[in-house]
Amino acid sequence: MVLTPDGEEFMDYARDILNRINKLEHSYRDGSHKKRKFGISVPRACYISAAFAEFSKNIGDGDVEIYYKETNSKKTIQKVLDNEYKLGIIRYSEAYDKHYKTMLEEKGLNCELVAEFSYVLIMSRDNPLASKETITYDDLSSYIEIAHADPYVPTLSMSKVFREELPDKIGQRIFVFERASQFDLLSENPKTFMWVSSASDKILDRYNLVQRVCEGNKKTYKDVLIYHKGYRLSKLDKDFITALCEARRKFLK
């Protein structure tokens, strides 16, 4: 059988299609066509979100899906256990370090210290406390505290955790679950304040806020990275951790 010119052109076209199909099948078999994925569940913290923003600038051109969840430690632990997220960062008072480490070991999770710090106060530049040379706990009693409504410590009742994390001296509190609303409240209401890990100058300037130390505040907190034992960190995981360490050095001095 002799192919006509049109037939030869058709066969060349068909061979080209078959070659493309074979290459596509090969890429799926060897994993080179897999969409990259990254997910992390974290506390509501400026330095962590800043790290995430920097990380997002360097994800490259390939297909990728990224998930970033802000929530409390209890939910983060559960999400990592359920493999909903491969990485998590939990925050807790140093006083409960043993509680957490015991629980994480029992659940088969690795834990690595990310940061250790004391909370500072943030408030509007128009807050009367902002101009005080020294701020004490008693000074805060006539102001409105912005707080997160979901503190958690393993083996302790929620009521006990609330008593320890949210002292009775403060008569007025507004509870929030995400950071955007807390900054709007702090910016617009000069009677409000909040305990936070250090915020960046960029955030403070954006919302017309100041950051102050409270005299007598000695409590130390830890942020800890968690993931399943045996889990191999991906390149995206490592890139995020690098950005996280850089943000920690910059923010938590």
Which residues fall in each region the model found?
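Beta-alpha-beta core module
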Residues: 106-112, 117, 180-230
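Hydrophobic hinge/microswitch elements
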Residues: 81-86, 150-210
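N-terminal winged-helix
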Residues: 19, 26-27, 31-78, 233-235
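Flexible hinge/capping segments at coil-to-helix
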Residues: 32, 103-119, 123-145
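A bilobed periplasmic-binding-protein/Venus flytrap-type ligand-binding module shared by bacterial periplasmic
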Residues: 122-130, 222-233
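Secondary-structure junction motif
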Residues: 48-54, 97, 137, 141-166
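Short beta-strand-centered segments that line the small-molecule binding cleft or hinge
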Residues: 53-54, 74-119, 123
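Alpha-helical "hinge/linker" immediately C-terminal to small N-terminal DNA-binding modules
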Residues: 2-30
